[in-house]
Amino acid sequence: GRFLALELSNIANLGAYLMPGGIISPTMHLGGLAGVYTTPAIYAEVSCVFSNTGSIGPYRGAGRPEASYIVERLIDNAAREMGIERAEIRRRNTIAADAMPYQTGLVFTYDCGEFEKNMDMAMHLADYGEFEARREDTQARGKLRGIGMANVTEQTSNNLGETVEIRIDSTGTATVIPGSSSHGQGHDTMYKILVSDRLGLDEDDIRVTQVDTDV
């Protein structure tokens, strides 16, 4: 039940003309083929072709979902063929938290991650252990029930830098002025935690000011 290698041959239909970002979907996913797993050797070959169909121009989120879909479907197929429970086969091949930093079989080096813990938490919240009982009950009522499983990694950013300024006044209060801004991810909370950890300040004494050109 150990993953030894992954080989991918991908033919991508770009449509009749090359649009901006058209090759993102078939190429940006390459590093993501490693997923959260210890697959030591990964080979990927991508061929982009033109056709008489509409051109491809992805807007958001393209590339990474394709990689996760490929890997997780392969794992499910392997689990069925080998008779190994699908959570167990994933567990046997998941990168351990104490193995970080971890160089994957293709492109990326992970600096941190508790992938098995994440999977266990999701299984607990989904009451995975009792799923078969729920399935049988559903089938008895003439309906079908299924459950999916996938471990997904997301490329969060590129390697471009960003600035942050920290001002500390005479009272010991810190004002953090980051170059990036929060739009739903809770950056302000994260900034306070980081500054508190590095400078030894209480989080109540840290103020985060975002998108204010007057400062």
Language model: regions and residue ranges:
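Helix-loop-helix junctions that connect adjacent transmembrane helices in secondary transporters/permeases
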Residues: T94-T173, I193
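Active-site-proximal helix/loop capping residues that flank conserved catalytic or ligand/cofactor
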Residues: Y37, Y69, A87, G113, ...
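Glycine-rich and small/hydrophobic secondary-structure elements
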Residues: R2, I56-E81, T104-D127, L199
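Gly/Pro-rich active-site capping loops and adjacent beta-alpha segments
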Residues: R2-A67, Q139-V215
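Molybdopterin (Moco) oxidoreductase catalytic core of the xanthine/aldehyde oxidoreductase family
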Residues: R2-M28, E81-D120
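Long, well-ordered alpha-helical segments
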Residues: S47, E72-N77, E81-R90, R198-T209
